[in-house]
C-alpha cells in the first residue's frame, strides 16, 4: 500500500508534493516510460516494526535492570534503543490507523484525524532525529574512550551524559515541531539533509581516526614481539571491513530517505524523481531495518548486556 501525501504532513510531503503527484500520472501517460515501484506489503512492514519494537524494548529493559550498565556509554545505547523503538512504533501506529480507516473500521472527525497525524508526525520526526543524534553521540563517546582513555571517566561523567541526552531529546522535539509546522518550505528539508550529512561525516571521521589509531597500536605490538607483517595487514583489513559495514549500513538505510528529501526540493516535477517518490515506503522500511540492526551492532556485542538479557527473558517466562 503506497502512502499518499494527504495522509502525512512532513513525511507525507516527502512522499509526494501536490505538484509532483498531480503531474505524475500525466507524465507517465505521455512518455509511456515505466516506473520501478517496489511494493512493500503492509504485513511485512508491520512485522519488521514489531521485531524492532521487541528488540529495542529488550535492550532498554536489560540496561535498566543491570546497574553495572548505568554508565554514560550504555546510557547513549539505551537512548538509541528508545529512539529506534519510537521510530518503529510511530510508523507502525500510523500504518495501522491508515489500514483501519481504509477498512472503515475507524470513523472519526477530520479535525481529530489531522491532530492525530500531526502528533504522529512530530513523534516520528523527533525520534528519527534522536536516533541520528545518538548514533553520533556513541561515536563521540567511543572516540573519547580511545584517545583520552586516562581522562575518559572524568570527561564522560554520568551527569554530563545525562545533560547531553536531555539536550538531544529537547532539541529534537522542538526541531520536529518546527519542521512539521513549516514542512512546505524547502529550507526545512535542506536542514534535515544537511543534518544527516553532518552526522555521516562526523561518524566517518571519528571511526576512521579510531581505526588508524587501532592499526598503529597493533603495528607497535607486532614490532615489539617481532611478528610478521601479514598479521598487521590482516588486522587492518578486518578493521576496515568492520568500519565499512558500520558506515555502509548507516548510509544504505538512511541515505535513500534523505536522497528523497533532496529530490523533493530540487526536482519535484521531474519524471525520474517522480518515480523515486513512489518508493517512499521502501525508504521508511530501510530505516525500520536500521532500527533492527542497531542493537546487533551497538548493544548485543556486550557480554554483560547479553547476560542480563538472558535474565530478563528468563524472568519474563
From Swiss-Prot:
The chain crosses the membrane at residues 38-63, 73-93, 119-140, 164-183, 192-211, 241-266, 280-300. One of its GO terms (biological process) is adenylate cyclase-activating G protein-coupled receptor signaling pathway. Glycans are attached at residue 29. InterPro entries: GPCR_Rhodpsn (IPR000276), GPCR_Rhodpsn_7TM (IPR017452), Melcrt_ACTH_rcpt (IPR001671), MSH_rcpt (IPR000761). Pfam families: 7tm_1. Residues 64-72, 141-163, 212-240, 301-317 are cytoplasmic. It comes from the Eukaryota. GO terms for molecular function: melanocyte-stimulating hormone receptor activity. Residues 1-37, 94-118, 184-191, 267-279 are extracellular. Keywords: Cell membrane, G-protein coupled receptor, Glycoprotein, Lipoprotein, Membrane, Palmitate, Receptor, Transducer, Transmembrane, Transmembrane helix. It is found in: Cell membrane. Belongs to the G-protein coupled receptor 1 family. Receptor for MSH (alpha, beta and gamma) and ACTH. The activity of this receptor is mediated by G proteins which activate adenylate cyclase. Mediates melanogenesis, the production of eumelanin (black/brown) and phaeomelanin (red/yellow), via regulation of cAMP signaling in melanocytes. This is Melanocyte-stimulating hormone receptor.
